[in-house]
């Protein structure tokens, strides 16, 4: 409603303020692109979720979320076999009817498909890819000098299996992303690098992710 829209505008403007303060420039990219773009980016073949189906009511769920909702583990990094074994060993049943799951995982693409002039196309699942595409034009705008930063605030679309977490896992949502283009040889000499080089980010390495921690 109107109040929610006002709140959303305030959030977006706060994001804009941070980017503008750091001399990033805003751009707006297309929301629909031909599939050759998404094939090149890797989204078309790999941007998917693992799903599992109830043998009784045929309801479909994200397999990793079924595990995470019942146990304090991060299942996103589980291999397919480990995920199935976990569901089997813990006797996790369908949340809708308590039926047993079919002992098989399948992949469902998160890409929203469409047709443009008879050609296969997809709605963008994030804003980064269409920000990279006009690099040459941006490079010319910034007088062919690096580094420069750009950002985009706009809609993204994902074919979510069962979006049950309100705005956090919607099929249509607004996303903000920024990109900093810098010469790799100059990355440690960037004028603002000294102000952030001591910052520590709480990132999980691949061993912890594989362990589901």
Question: Where are the model-predicted features located?
Answer:
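TRNA-recognition modules of translation machinery and tRNA-sensing kinases, especially anticodon-binding
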Residues: 1-213
């Amino acid at each position: 409603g109107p109040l929610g829209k006002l709140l959303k505008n305030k959030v977006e403007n706060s994001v804009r303020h941070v980017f503008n303060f750091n001399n990033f420039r805003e751009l707006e990219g297309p929301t629909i692109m031909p599939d050759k773009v998404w094939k090149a980016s890797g989204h078309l073949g790999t941007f998917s979720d693992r799903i599992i189906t109830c043998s009784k009511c045929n309801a479909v769920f994200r397999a990793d979320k079924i595990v995470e909702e019942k146990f304090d583990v991060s299942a996103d990094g589980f291999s397919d076999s480990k995920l199935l074994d976990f569901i089997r060993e813990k006797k996790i049943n369908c949340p809708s009817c308590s039926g047993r799951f079919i002992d098989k995982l399948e992949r469902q693409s998160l890409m929203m498909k469409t047709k443009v002039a008879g050609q296969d196309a997809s709605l963008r699942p994030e804003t980064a890819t269409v920000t990279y595409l006009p690099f040459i034009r941006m490079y010319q705008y910034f007088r062919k000098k690096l580094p420069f930063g750009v950002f985009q605030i706009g809609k993204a679309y994902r074919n979510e299996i069962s979006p049950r977490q309100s705005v956090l896992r919607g099929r249509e949502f607004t996303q903000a992303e920024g990109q900093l283009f810098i010469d790799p040889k100059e990355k440690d000499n960037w004028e603002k690098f000294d102000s952030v080089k001591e910052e520590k980010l709480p990132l999980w390495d691949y061993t912890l992710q594989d362990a589901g921690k």
